[in-house]
Structure formats: C-alpha cells, structure tokens
Amino acid sequence: MGTVLGAMRNVRWHELQHAYGSASQVPGVLSRIAWGDAPTSDEALSDLERWIGTPPVFDSTAATVPFLWELAATDTVRDRAGVLDLLATILAAGNAEHPAWTRAAHDAVAAGRATAARLAAAPEAPEVPGAPVAPGSPDAPGAQAVRTAAARLLAAIDRHQYLACPACPAPPPRET
C-alpha cells in the first residue's frame, strides 16, 4: 500500500461497524478512492458516505477520518473535494444513542484543521498559455474545487462548538 493509507493495517476493522454491518471492507473502499479510476473512485466515495457519513455516525467513522484526511491531502486522489465534503458531513452528523462515537468522529475531523487550512490557502498558479498542467498543481482540474471544499470545511470546524452541537454530548466539567 505504500505510505498512503499504510497505517490502515493497524486498525481492527473487523471489530468495528458501519451502517450496514462490519467495517472490514472499509480499507478496500479507501484504497479504491486513493487509486481507482474515476468511476471506481466515485463509487467507492459514495459507498463510504453511505456507510460512515450519513447520520448516524458509527464506531468506524472516527477510525476512518484520519485516512480521509490523508486522502484529502494526497494530490493524486481524484476527488479530493468529495473527500473534504464527506468530512464536513461527518462533522454535522451524530448518533444520539452513542454520543462517544459522535464526539470521537467530530474530534477526528477537527484534528485535521491544519490540513483544511493548508488546502484552502493553496495559491492559484499563474496562467502560462500552452503549458501542461501537472497533476496536483494549483491549476490541475479540481484544484479550485478542493480549495473551495477545504474553505467550507475549515469554516465548519471553526464554527463547530460542542456545547451548541445537538449531536455532541456536553464535555465533562473541568476541575478547577
């Protein structure tokens, strides 16, 4: 698997659940998002959104989020904007029956704030007529969509307050 998604093997996916059962197939879906052709990647992202991103969140959601951040930051991933949108969906989702899952998922999304800020601030490359556009360059197809999705997610992270979040339980009181 190389360095991208290499840490997936450290997660006990078979012990986690998503909306339709065991999360054991999540690593394969993440791999298809990372390396699949456009139709394969799109289908995998759609599957993952149904499994972990639609309300409610599951125990596998928080385990998946760090890998979504990794994909969002990897220039060769085809739909990085879609990955960022899935992270925003997770931040807005919850599970009233399992508030710890909600908090873990929201914390995992918030932990990637620096990545969202970097992606949102990526400079636009100056236009050079006739110059080829390299994958991952600021003018590559989808680069503006990534900047826009990252800016939306960054704003959502900054607005997200656990006390105001209906999906999040109140944090424990701090001892003084």
Task: Locate predicted features.
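Alpha-helical solenoid scaffolds in large eukaryotic transport, assembly, and signaling factors
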Residues: 2, 9-74, 80, 84-96, ...
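Arginine residue identity/basic-tract feature
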Residues: 9-12, 32, 50, 78-80, ...
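Positions within the helices of HEAT/ARM-like alpha-solenoid repeats
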Residues: 39-43, 60, 64, 78-80, ...
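Eukaryote-biased recognition of C-terminal alpha-helical segments
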Residues: 109-124, 136-164, 169-172
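Actinobacteria-biased recognition of intrinsically disordered, low-complexity terminal regions
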Residues: 1-24, 127-138, 165-176
